[in-house]
Amino acid sequence: MKVLILSCSTGGGHNSCANYIKEELTLNNIECNFIDFFDIFGKNAKKMSSDIYLKTLGNNGKIFKNVYKAGEFVSKSKLQSPVYIFNKMFKKKLYEYIQKNNYTLVITTHLFPSLTLTAINNDKKYKHIPFLFVATDYEPCPFMEEANPEYFIMQKTLENAFIQKGISETKLLNTGIPVSSNFIKNAKSIRSEYNISDDENVILIMLGSMGFGEIDNIINPLLKENIKIIVICGTNKQLYEKLNEYKNDNLIVIGFTKNINDFIYSSDYVLSKPGGLSSTEIASIHKPLLHIYPIPGIETYNTLFFGNNKMSIKCDTDKEIIDNIKYLMNNEEICKEMIQNQKKIINENSASDLVKFILDHFN
């Protein structure tokens, strides 16, 4: 067996999920490679997809919200979407790439390559390519129903949402959003590296891979609480430089990091954008969680899923963020309940369970 993992650089979660799957496959001695889908078609294609995504995040995500709503509307119409037609254009080159490199199974963590693979399998002049589509959020996205993989990998209890989109129940594998076993078991405390004592409260603020969100209005009030604050800025250099101007010993500013598990493990409370993968990472390490600054659309659904299952608290305003962090700090029982719900609902063995399934069904 030789596995190709395909993602797209539209938000960090899709790529992180792909890397977790690669890591788990490698641990099981399965030959595999991970590549950005658009890298197969050249730098221009990749840059175009990334630029379009970044532009939709403008105006505090309002453009993305409108695009997402339009997508939901078109998806309900059951007509062939422009998204499918666009990705269909890449089928010949993707097919040739897969055949040339002798891949026997493809795993996708993004809609785009899933639609291209579906177009390949719908064309009788090509050999069938078995593939799995990993849903990295807590709601099926628009046009997901146009993909036709062997299986959709998704979160348990969301079966009805997928079925309502016209996806067959027989294609659902509810092992959960994959987070590698090493991410969880290798997480370690890094408090001593940042001169944080064991008795100090630490708030971790995660703003996504691109550092999305204005946090000035919450940083100042939180610094008055005499607690340590760690902010992960991702690739947002402007935010990184701006926060470093505070020159406050209680504020630790981090750019892009590959050991986010250590920062989650070392914190007492986490404030995070409600990305599907990042929320799963936090819940897998079991931390009280506030969801902040959702990108309207799919992240709204992630917030609802976590909130409805009492795994996080949704904060819509700066005041709610400040009030709720104080609420958690003064209510240990609420934090314990949140953590218990995370343990009950989120599968810590999601990646290893997926690999076991692959070995049983595709080896």
Across the structure, where does each feature detected by a protein language model lie?
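C-terminal alpha-helical cap of glycosyltransferases
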Residues: 347-363
